[in-house]
């Protein structure tokens, strides 16, 4: 059966993974006809480090012991603390009650909201008019209402256009080509910079992100794929080769691209780029997700247990060690021939 790497030639795959060509051949076309669903004769086991299990067990035991000790200490002190707290709360309640009762006798509480204050003042003014007449009280009430409206306008002025002000003041420009801005770097291969909604929040509204890639001469951006986004590659300088393989291992694109050309890479299609011999290869990738996620083949291999790789691709342990332990630990690769 074919693997997803079947669409890449053996030489390029060996350079990308920094391994020998016979190992690359196994990865490209493993001698295995089992397909995607297999029957396990001796039972299925999950490969996991034993030390990790022991550490988790000891950690859980320590956690349980600490919780028991905390409960015991809590039970010892809770009774006394509850009694003290009850006494203090009772005293505070009595003090508050005395203060409130005295204040209520002197004056009624004034309402806080604008509408209720207005009604309250009208009610007070009506009482005054009944006993003292209407002239001076009405003028005083009108002045107070005008003052209240002015205060209300001042408070609402800052909130009226909050969303528009946020958008107008938002940062809309980011220079991801700046060398100090690089997220991934290989002194012999190049550098990669990304920008998404975490670094430029306005991209959340656009639902877009971008990736800037600069490959030095013969530098390789090893096979990788976008998990949650389609992408559009635009060349801004130099020339390089772009290889695209679909999820069935079939080659769908393998050609050189140069300044001003576009290449569309669908989601979950494996893509790899390599700069030419004469000059570097500089391009930007626009992605249809503001937090696009990328998986790299070489990092997936390094994270996969060696026994799984050996059984899946028919590799010897020495070949597995080449894949997992050799240089070029990031997605940017400098070919060994350089």
UniProtKB/Swiss-Prot annotation:
One Pfam family, short name please?
Cupin_1
InterPro entries attached to this UniProt entry: 11S_seedstore_CS (IPR022379), 11S_seedstore_pln (IPR006044), Cupin_1 (IPR006045), RmlC-like_jellyroll (IPR014710), RmlC_Cupin_sf (IPR011051), Seed_Storage-Functional (IPR050253)
Q: Does the keyword Disulfide bond apply?
A: yes
- Where does the UniProt annotation place the signal sequence? none
PROSITE patterns found in the cross-reference section: 11S_SEED_STORAGE (PS00305)
Keyword match Disulfide bond: yes
The residues covered by the Cupin type-1 domain are: 174-321
- Which keywords describe this protein according to UniProt? Disulfide bond, Seed storage protein, Storage protein
Composition-biased stretches (Acidic residues): 82-92, 136-150
Q: Where is the composition biased (Basic and acidic residues)?
A: 18-44
Under CDD domains, the record lists: cupin_11S_legumin_C
Q: Region (Disordered) spans which residues?
A: 16-162
Q: Name one GO molecular function term.
A: nutrient reservoir activity
Role played: This protein found in the seeds of many leguminous and non-leguminous plants is the source of sulfur-containing amino acids in seed meals.
Indicate the quaternary assembly. Hexamer; each subunit is composed of an acidic and a basic chain derived from a single precursor and linked by a disulfide bond.
The UniProt entry's sequence similarity note says:
Belongs to the 11S seed storage protein (globulins) family.
Checking PANTHER family in the record gives: GLYCININ G5 (PTHR31189:SF63), OS03G0336100 PROTEIN-RELATED (PTHR31189)
- This one is known as Legumin B
Q: Which organism is it from?
A: Pisum sativum (Garden pea)
Gene transcribed to yield this protein? LEGB
């Amino acid at each position: 059966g074919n693997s997803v790497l079947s669409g890449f030639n053996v030489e390029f795959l060996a350079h990308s993974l920094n391994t020998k060509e016979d190992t690359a051949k196994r990865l490209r076309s493993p001698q295995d006809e089992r397909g995607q669903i297999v029957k396990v004769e001796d039972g299925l086991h999950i490969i996991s480090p034993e030390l990790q299990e022991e550490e988790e067990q000891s950690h859980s035991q320590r956690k349980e012991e600490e919780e028991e000790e905390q409960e015991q200490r809590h039970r010892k002190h809770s009774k006394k603390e509850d009694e003290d707290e009850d006494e203090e709360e009772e005293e505070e309640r009595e003090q508050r009650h005395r203060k409130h009762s005295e204040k209520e006798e002197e004056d009624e509480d004034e309402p806080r909201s604008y509408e209720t204050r207005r009604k309250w003042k009208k009610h007070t003014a009506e009482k005054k008019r009944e006993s003292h007449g209407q002239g001076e009280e009405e003028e005083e009430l009108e002045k107070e209402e005008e003052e209240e409206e002015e205060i209300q306008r001042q408070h609402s002025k800052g909130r009226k256009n909050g969303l528009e002000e946020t958008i107008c003041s938002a940062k809309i420009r980011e220079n991801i080509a700046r060398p100090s801005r690089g997220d991934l770097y290989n002194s012999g291969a190049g550098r990669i910079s990304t920008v998404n909604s975490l670094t430029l929040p306005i991209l959340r509204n656009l639902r877009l992100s971008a990736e800037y890639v600069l490959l030095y001469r013969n530098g390789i951006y090893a096979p990788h794929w976008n998990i949650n986004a389609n992408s559009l590659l635009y060349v801004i300088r130099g020339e390089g080769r772009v290889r695209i393989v679909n999820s069935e291992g079939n080659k769908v694109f393998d050609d050189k691209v140069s300044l001003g050309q576009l290449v569309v890479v669908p989601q979950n299609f494996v893509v790899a780029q390599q700069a030419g011999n004469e000059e570097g290869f500089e391009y930007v990738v626009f992605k249809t997700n503001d937090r696009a996620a990328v998986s790299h083949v070489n990092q997936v291999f390094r994270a996969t247990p060696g026994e799984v790789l050996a059984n899946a691709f028919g590799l010897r342990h020495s070949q597995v060690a080449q894949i997992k332990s050799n240089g070029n630990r990031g997605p940017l690769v400098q070919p060994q021939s350089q």
